[in-house]
Amino acid sequence: MAVPRRKTSPSRRGMRRSADAIKRPTYVEDKDSGELRRPHHLDLKTGMYKGRQVLKKKDS
């Protein structure tokens, strides 16, 4: 059975755990519609991505 040779220090343990935190999703305001959307994602209401029409506009 594998056993560690040395005790993991609190500093090293903390550095290992630093990547475990769940981060809140970021949102940006769309330039065209003013709606909030995820960065690098298309706007589902308008169907625009990077200034181009990729999907048909959602009729609601």
Swiss-Prot record:
GO terms for molecular function: structural constituent of ribosome. Keywords: Ribonucleoprotein, Ribosomal protein. Gene3D superfamilies: Single helix bin. GO terms for biological process: translation. This is Large ribosomal subunit protein bL32. It comes from the Bacteria. Belongs to the bacterial ribosomal protein bL32 family. Residues 1-60 are annotated as: Disordered. It comes from Rhodopseudomonas palustris (strain ATCC BAA-98 / CGA009). One of its GO terms (cellular component) is large ribosomal subunit. Coiled coil: none annotated. Residues 1-16 have a biased composition (Basic residues). The gene is rpmF. Pfam families: Ribosomal_L32p.
